């Protein structure tokens, strides 16, 4: 379980993942080794999944960000979700309740690539009954799971 110090360390890392342990330690008034040990423990326990740059795909040469709802044959949802999660174009994927079984966000460079993804990749996965694709025309917030 996370204590208040862990939560404060996470807060500062979420604000700027490049912030040094020594800077966080100085702000929090604890030794640098304390921050280092706690971050290492949170990585080991999967609380921190990884450190990565959060990019704007539109500025990085990608023109299409789409949300795809997927309907799957009964009893194949987990199997299909695992196969979809392996595809490079998939940024976020989750099994859902409600009208559709799976939702995913994909990023591709063009409409042609989106078509290839839908027909050549999704079309070959056994168990998918149907998909519904929505292309985002603009994005107002890029984020991450802010928990603190």
From Swiss-Prot:
InterPro entries: ArsR-like_HTH, AsnC-type_HTH_dom, Dimeric_a/b-barrel, Tscrpt_reg_AsnC-like, Tscrpt_reg_AsnC/Lrp_C, WH-like_DNA-bd_sf, WH_DNA-bd_sf. One of its GO terms (cellular component) is cytosol. GO terms for molecular function: sequence-specific DNA binding. Keywords: DNA-binding, Transcription, Transcription regulation. The keyword Zinc does not apply. Residues 21-40 bind DNA. It comes from the Archaea. Residues 2-63 form the HTH asnC-type domain. SUPFAM superfamilies: Dimeric alpha+beta barrel, Winged helix' DNA-binding domain. This is Uncharacterized HTH-type transcriptional regulator PF1231. It comes from Pyrococcus furiosus (strain ATCC 43587 / DSM 3638 / JCM 8422 / Vc1).
